[in-house]
Amino acid sequence: MQQNPLGKEELDDDVQTQEPAKVILFNDDVHTFDEVIGQLVKATKCTREKAEALAWEVHNNGRAVVFGGDLNKCVEVSSILEEIQLMTQIEV
């Protein structure tokens, strides 16, 4: 932080003022593991192994953060997951 001429503190330009957004995927009793894994790979561009781990986390905990990044990218990922009616939420 630095002070401006009025004595008020300002954030340095290189300090990020906003945390990245997160996509949360919720468990359901409709989709198979293979459907969820395939859609996670498509949406997040992760490996199948990572998608499997995320699918198990969703299954075991009822939900999981499956992606983090800027809001626009999170909206894109969420939209792809919802193509097959998976339930998601974006947190900022």
Residue ranges of predicted features:
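Terminal domain-initiation and capping elements
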Residues: M1-V92
